UniProtKB/Swiss-Prot annotation:
This protein's pathway: Polyol metabolism; glycerol degradation via glycerol kinase pathway; sn-glycerol 3-phosphate from glycerol: step 1/1
Alphabetically ordered keywords of this record: ATP-binding, Glycerol metabolism, Kinase, Nucleotide-binding, Transferase
Residues reported in the UniProt entry to bind ATP: 15-17, 272, 316, 320, 417
Gene name tied to this protein: glpK
Function, in words: Key enzyme in the regulation of glycerol uptake and metabolism. Catalyzes the phosphorylation of glycerol to yield sn-glycerol 3-phosphate.
Catalytically driven reaction(s): glycerol + ATP = sn-glycerol 3-phosphate + ADP + H(+)
Organism: Mycoplasmopsis pulmonis (strain UAB CTIP) (Mycoplasma pulmonis)
Protein name from the UniProt record: Glycerol kinase
Listed InterPro entries: ATPase_NBD (IPR043129), Carb_kinase_FGGY (IPR000577), Carb_kinase_FGGY_CS (IPR018483), FGGY_C (IPR018485), FGGY_N (IPR018484), Glycerol_kin (IPR005999)
GO cellular component terms given for this protein: cytosol
Regulation: Inhibited by fructose 1,6-bisphosphate (FBP).
Amino acid sequence: MENNEKYIITLDSGTTSCRSLIVNKKGEIIAIAQNEFSQYFPKSGWVEHDPLEIWNTQLSTMQSVKNKAQIKSSDIVALGITNQRETIVVWDKDTGLPVYNAIVWQDVRTSSFCDQMIAENKTEFFREKTGLIINPYFSATKLKWILENVPLAKEKLAKGKLLAGTIDTWLIWKLTGGKVHASDVSNASRTMLFNIHSLDWDQEILDYLKIPRSILPKVQASSEFYGFVQSSLWSNKAKGKVPITGVAGDQQSALFGQMCTEVGMVKNTYGTGCFTLVNTGQKPVNSKNRLLTTIAWKLGNEKTIYALEGSVFVAGAAIQWLRDSLRILYNAALSDFYSSLVKDNQRVYVVPAFTGLGAPYWDSYAKGAIFGLERGTKNEHIIKATLESIAYQSNDLIKAMEKDLGQKITLLKVDGGASKSDYLMNFQASISNLDVHRPANVETTALGAAYLAGLAVGFWKDIKEIQKMIKIDHQFKPSVDQKEVDVLLKGWNEAVKRVLNWQKDIE
């Protein structure tokens, strides 16, 4: 059979849904299957997922996308995985059953413990080794919480039966029938346990947090062989031996999917949150502006590539909030339409700090607020201001990056669900004074994992071959007068100032 009749499958395990995609040799997605899964909020600030539900949801999309594409498992040359990062799963290696729900990246239950570590002057200790700042966002304190607060975890640990990992590790373990306990460098670099210089779990950190190395996965390159998918997972008759050869955290995968392979190239993913990454090459750059130094990817035996990252916790999730909680929007896709019904935002600002604020503020005590309300304020103004809040938060990251890089960023490559909003992209170009390029295929997160998997098996020869396949759908240029931009930004900065530390101030 010709090579062009072979395919890559990508599993994209997100925060609210699992998707599986089939990609052909031209880099085209020929089939997608997607299913949402449940979110659990047991207490204020707590966010959990059921790991078995994630696995079953992911598996069902994997099986249905193969059937949708009308291909056999033997037509699939490799499988790539990309996933929500930082979310931690702990399970029994004999039964394969989780000892507790997965604690999600948005969960802030460990805020006070993080405050305690900061008070103990541990900030530099962690930043130097991991490139991260101390924050409940990362896996380390979530894992420590499970080990200390879940009796079943203590019991299994004492018997040497406990395994832990991020979502990629959990999926690899399930896909290989419990044969492989592994993660890739990009996911490991988000745990706050991994030394990004030595590329290994940091023993001093493990000792300090009392986390045994034995429960942690082996860490591999983002593009290399991990293990084979159990044939029976495709169907009872499946014969294909599909290797898992590409693994990356969702944001690093999007950076690769956008082919930001040169130093200084920047992408922003507009998903549940917003994530801006800039490729810094083979050198980790220490941020002076509270951005994260992180591993972008590692291709086989090649040198590790690093990035600077800024994270916005609530972006597309703010539009979901308008739809599900406030009910002033029935369909998230209509936010552009409603925004167009009003000339401007009437100086209304929405600060969607529902789970605190991410970079460059890193304030887990901030709360969301709407400012500038008048008697004449309509739903449309609030919808418009909510869309704009996504651009304002992203702009805060871009400006911090420019300071760290010592240069102006002139081009932003965008992807993710909310990047389909022309109003948001136009506003982003104007507010940040740069060109915005949206690719014809905004599924760059899933494509990144497909490219990583494909390169490892020679499906694509090299990065150059992949670059030729990428097409730009639309270019947005700044269109708002700079004086007006300055006025808008002044209002935004004032609004943010007023929500900082809110919860602590009122307690």
